Amino acid sequence: MEVHHVTEGAETFTCNAFLVIGEETTLVDAGSWDGVVDVIADHTDDLDRVVLTHQHGDHVEQLEAVVEAFDPEVYAHSHHELRDHDISDGDTVQIGDEEFEVVYTPGHADDHVSFVSESTLFSGDVVVHDDGAFEYGSFGRTDMPGQSREQLIESIEDILERMPADVEHMYAGHGGIFHGDVRDVVETALERAEKREPKYPEE
C-alpha cells in the first residue's frame, strides 16, 4: 500500500494526514496545515475520498480546502456539513486498495473511529506509537471536556479484539509511523491507559 504522510513537513500544529494511493485514492484526515492541498497535488490529481477518524480541529480544519480542490466523497461517523457518507461501527470502507473495517473508538472524542484491515491500522488519536508522553505505545489524552479514560480503555480493547494478528503497519493521528508488531504497541498502550494515571503531569 502506497502511503504518503501529507503533513510531515508542517511547521504548525496539525494531526498526521495520510494520502493512500490506489484504486480508491483516499486521504485519512485532512489536518490543519494550509499546505495539505499542495502536497496532495504533488502526488495525484484524483482524490476519490476523505475518511475522518474524528472531527477535532487539527483533523478537519483543511477539509473544506481539500473538498474544493479535489471534490472527493467525505466519510465520517458524525454529522459534518461536507459529509457524503455516514460510517458506523462494523461498516467497511475501501482505503487505497484495501478494505478496512470501521471500529467505533470513543474516549478521546465521542465521534472517533479507527480503521483496520488485514495489514494496517489507522488508529487516529486512540493509540499512537510515540508522542510527547511515551516513546512506545501511547494513547490519546482524556483530560478535556467530553473525553473519558474508561471509554478509551474499552476502545483499545475493541481494537485488539478485532485486529487481525498479522497487522504490521500503524498510522496514528500523532507521533511516528510504526512498522512491525502493531499488536504489541496497542497492548502496551492499553497497559498504560489501564493504570489510570495522568498522561501528562498537568492532567
Question: Which role fits each region the language model picked out?
Answer:
Residues 33, 110-193, 197:
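Metallo-beta-lactamase
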Residues 99-103:
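Conserved N-terminal boundary motif of the eukaryotic protein kinase catalytic domain
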Residues 27, 75, 170-171:
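Structural detector of well-ordered beta-strand residues that form the stable sheet scaffold
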